[in-house]
């Protein structure tokens, strides 16, 4: 029997390479458009987006076609939600608001079968035709925890002791809110906190991730961030603005 599909993002992290993840995806058609561009993973939005369970299955299939790892952000750190998300074809989960060691342990154990955790025994789409699926799923499934509150940074030393977490992702926007800088993740205090968290993650021998854009991606990669997530929306907005400016400035 064939092996489970390889998780490209997890393989690149294991090789010490940077991973590129594209977000802002709401349909399988958009994933098909993004697929040929070469991103390693697709960030499917289950917390802030409108993706249904039926759509999630189709979107993860589209990721499989383009060898992009389907990584889905769930809306809560709940075992049943993690299980169903993985059963629908996701090869990784992003768990929001992980502020304590106990929350990190819950996230990791919800995504793994025994003896590593207690993910519900079913398997779903990625298990079809795969021998020894449960062990292979444990090897290929990614767990990403979001550090998006100042409480998480205060407890970071303990959180970093939790096994079977692939990426500790420092989320700037929510972090800024909890630090008293609503809507201003670029505030120097927030940026210092992000950089300090990244340094602590790396010093513990773990993988750091964060949100990046064209302006700061080089800086974060230089700091040692290996898991990057960005959105295509800004590129469309920039291109549209440039196009409209050219039209407005052309005499006819």
Regions found by a protein language model. Give the residues of each.
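Short, acidic/polar
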Residues: 23-37, 76-84, 151-162, 212-218
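N-terminal amphipathic alpha-helix/helix-capping segment at the start of soluble metabolic enzymes
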Residues: 1-23, 130-139, 195-203, 252
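C-terminal helical cap(s) of enzyme catalytic domains, especially alpha/beta-barrels
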Residues: 59, 63, 101-116, 233-252
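Conserved, mostly hydrophobic/aromatic
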Residues: 22, 34, 45, 93, ...
């Amino acid at each position: 029997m064939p092996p489970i599909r390889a998780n490209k993002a997890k393989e690149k992290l294991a090789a010490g390479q940077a991973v590129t993840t594209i977000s802002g995806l709401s349909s399988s058609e958009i994933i098909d458009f993004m697929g040929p561009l070469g991103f390693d993973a697709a960030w499917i939005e289950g917390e802030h987006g409108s993706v249904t369970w039926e759509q999630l299955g189709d979107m993860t299939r589209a990721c499989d076609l383009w060898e992009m790892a389907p990584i889905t952000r769930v809306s809560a750190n709940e075992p049943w939600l993690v299980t169903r998300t993985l059963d629908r074809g996701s090869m990784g989960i992003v768990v929001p608001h992980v502020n304590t060691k106990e929350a990190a342990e819950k996230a990791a154990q919800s995504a793994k079968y025994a003896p590593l955790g207690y993910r519900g025994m079913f398997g779903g789409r990625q298990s079809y035709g795969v021998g020894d699926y449960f062990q292979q799923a444990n090897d290929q499934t990614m767990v990403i925890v979001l550090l998006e509150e100042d409480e998480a940074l205060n407890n970071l030393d303990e959180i970093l002791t939790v096994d079977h977490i692939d990426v500790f992702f420092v989320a700037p926007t929510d972090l800024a809110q909890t630090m008293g800088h609503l809507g201003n993740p670029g505030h120097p205090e927030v940026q210092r906190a992000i950089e300090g968290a990244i340094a602590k993650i790396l010093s513990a021998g773990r993988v750091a991730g964060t949100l990046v854009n064209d302006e700061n991606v080089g800086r974060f990669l230089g700091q040692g961030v290996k898991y990057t997530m960005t959105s295509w929306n800004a590129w469309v907005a920039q291109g549209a603005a440039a196009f409209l400016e050219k039209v407005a400035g052309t005499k006819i």
